[in-house]
């Protein structure tokens, strides 16, 4: 509801100008959620103008305790339009977050296997090894893919919570050997949250490899190339 449809209209104009040079895919982001009526109105309008449905269930969980309902709305919309769904989950490096697991359950419930992509998954590393590997099995059942955005939360604040020692990154070193497709993204570019993030995919990729201690060059090439196409459905 902040920018209404102005940004996506401009984006479509840009896509038309550069259509011979690059393939552009658009997704929305529900920074104000999908529960509040005005936010829902603009979500419904915007969902007709994008190539994949994007969402942030934490917004509605924080404001209304209705994060699971928000997932239902996102997945229902994506399914009805026959497009993929990209959902930001487990962003805050906390063992209290289980959004990736919840999204797996909702993906299967809505029959959206292979059409849902989780973004971040940072808090997965804060859980026990037993939980993590049970989650990877559930991700395989849901055919869920993951987009890592390493710069987004590498500056995680110091905490007094007890959790397994790890860096605040998507655990790509565990996911990839478990058969989960991992791609790379950025969230966000030189904004007030991450002012030093330049949107450079090499910066993101090198941080992921170093931070996960995962110098598998073949896997990194896949993350930067074919896996990116998979999560975009191209």
How should each PLM-predicted stretch be described?
Residues 29-31, 58, 90, 151-152, ...:
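Short, ordered loop/turn segments at secondary-structure junctions
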Residues 158-160, 229:
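N-terminal beta-loop-helix "entrance" segment that forms/cooperates
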Residues 84, 105-116, 168-234:
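His/Asp/Glu-enriched, well-ordered alpha-helical/loop segment
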Residues 6-20, 36-146, 162-184:
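Histidine/acidic residue-rich metal-binding segments in metalloenzymes
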Residues 92, 123-125, 152-155, 189-191:
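Short, catalytically relevant binding-site loops at active-site mouths
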Residues 145, 150-158:
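Active-site clefts of carbohydrate-active enzymes
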Residues 20-28:
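Short beta-strand/loop segments at the ligand-binding rim of alpha/beta enzyme cores
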């Amino acid at each position: 509801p902040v920018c209404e449809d102005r940004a996506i209209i401009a984006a479509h104009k840009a896509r038309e100008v550069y259509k011979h040079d690059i393939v552009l895919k658009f997704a929305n982001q529900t920074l104000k959620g999908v529960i509040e009526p005005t936010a829902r109105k603009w979500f419904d309008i915007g969902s007709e103008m994008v190539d994949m449905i994007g969402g942030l269930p934490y917004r509605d969980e924080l404001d209304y305790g209705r994060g699971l309902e928000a997932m239902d709305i996102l997945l229902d919309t994506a399914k009805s339009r026959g497009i993929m769904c990209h959902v930001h989950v487990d962003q805050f490096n906390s063992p209290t977050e289980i959004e990736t697991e919840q999204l797996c359950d909702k993906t299967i419930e809505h029959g959206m296997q292979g059409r849902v992509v989780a973004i971040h998954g940072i808090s997965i590393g804060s859980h026990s090894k037993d939980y993590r590997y049970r989650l990877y099995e559930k991700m395989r059942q849901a055919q869920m893919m993951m987009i890592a955005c390493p710069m987004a939360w590498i500056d995680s604040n110091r905490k007094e919570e007890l959790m397994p020692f790890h860096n605040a990154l998507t655990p790509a070193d565990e996911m990839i050997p478990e058969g989960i497709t991992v791609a790379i993204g950025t969230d966000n570019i030189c904004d007030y949250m991450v002012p030093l993030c330049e949107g450079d995919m090499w910066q993101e990729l090198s941080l992921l490899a170093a931070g996960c201690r995962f110098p598998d060059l073949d896997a990194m090439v896949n993350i930067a190339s074919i896996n990116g196409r998979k999560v975009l459905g191209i």
